[in-house]
């Protein structure tokens, strides 16, 4: 477009002049007019491009509100379940939490936190929660559930999924878009958009409805990764989206397999996770082992 304007200006027939003064005016003013035209045109093109980006963002948000998140918890439902789960014994440091839900296409449907305001949780855990949800959705199937905790051992050097954690990066534009005052609210800027990302420690779980359909995933972050897993598990159960068809834990679901407890070699060891100890003490493995069973 810019080149066309310049060519058009250069090919314009030079007018006749009746005095040197008229030529001077032509020489000084016309290039300025051409420059202004180019700048204006580029500005319009930029505005159109920005409008297209805004339209795409609006399309995602409209899709979320129009049914793409149907069957998944609302912001209020997610927060209520998350608060209830966080209030139980989960190990860790009993910290406030972030939670996020994505649908099967990886679109964020809800983001919430348990504290009185967004600063009561680790600010960085908002994006981590969404990243965990994206991971659990991205690497689970209708017949096989994988929690983010199940991925830890497999992505270590020499593991069967080594390097997975570096694939599918977080969309930083989505992660940090919008006013911070909206973070964790029903209009969180991530809602209606794809966050991406791969996280390989505890806190992300796939979501299966009563028909055993894989409908998305939940991610929880804000404490030790083991506590995150336990809180995510209780939150999913509270939401009745835990009709898990099968998994790699000893009991055939997507529960965490703790290293040092599962036998070696075994499938569970291949998809295991370290115990989150405090001052060298294991206070969490017994909690994870006693989590409510998934629905059948």
Model-predicted segments: where are they?
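Intrinsically disordered, low-complexity segments enriched in serine/proline and basic residues
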Residues: 1-8, 15-18
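Flexible, solvent-exposed loop/hinge segments and secondary-structure transition points
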Residues: 53-296
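Bacterial N-terminal signal peptides that target proteins for export
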Residues: 23-34
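Bacterial N-terminal signal peptides
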Residues: 33-43
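Signal peptide processing junction and immediate N-terminal pro/mature segment
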Residues: 44-55
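Extended rod-forming repeat segments used as scaffolds/tethers
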Residues: 9-10, 35, 235
């Amino acid at each position: 477009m810019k080149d066309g304007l310049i060519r058009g200006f250069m090919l314009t027939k030079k007018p006749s002049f009746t005095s040197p003064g008229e030529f001077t005016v032509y020489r000084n003013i016309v290039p300025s007019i051409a420059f202004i035209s180019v700048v204006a045109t580029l500005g319009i093109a930029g505005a159109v491009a920005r409008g297209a980006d805004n339209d795409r963002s609006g399309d995602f948000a409209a899709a979320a509100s129009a049914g793409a998140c149907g069957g998944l918890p609302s912001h209020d439902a997610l927060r209520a379940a998350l608060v209830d789960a966080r209030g139980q014994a989960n190990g860790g440091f009993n910290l406030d939490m972030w939670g996020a839900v994505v649908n099967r296409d990886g679109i964020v449907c809800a983001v919430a936190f348990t504290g009185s305001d967004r600063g009561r949780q680790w600010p960085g855990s908002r994006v981590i929660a969404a990243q965990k949800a994206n991971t659990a959705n991205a690497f689970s199937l209708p017949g096989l559930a994988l929690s983010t905790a199940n991925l830890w051992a497999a992505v270590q050097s020499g593991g069967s999924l080594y390097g997975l954690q570096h694939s599918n990066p977080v969309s930083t534009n989505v992660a940090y878009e919008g006013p911070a005052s909206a973070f964790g609210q029903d209009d969180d800027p991530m809602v209606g958009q794809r966050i991406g990302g791969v996280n390989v420690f505890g806190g992300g779980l796939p979501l299966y409805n009563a028909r055993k359909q894989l409908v998305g995933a939940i991610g929880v972050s804000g404490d030790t990764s083991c506590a995150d897993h336990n809180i995510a598990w209780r939150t999913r159960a509270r939401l009745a989206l835990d009709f898990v068809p099968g998994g790699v834990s000893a009991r055939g679901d997507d529960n965490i397999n703790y290293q040092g407890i599962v036998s070696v070699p075994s499938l569970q060891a291949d998809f295991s996770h370290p115990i989150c100890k405090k001052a060298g003490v294991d206070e969490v493995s017994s909690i994870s082992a006693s989590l409510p069973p998934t629905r059948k």
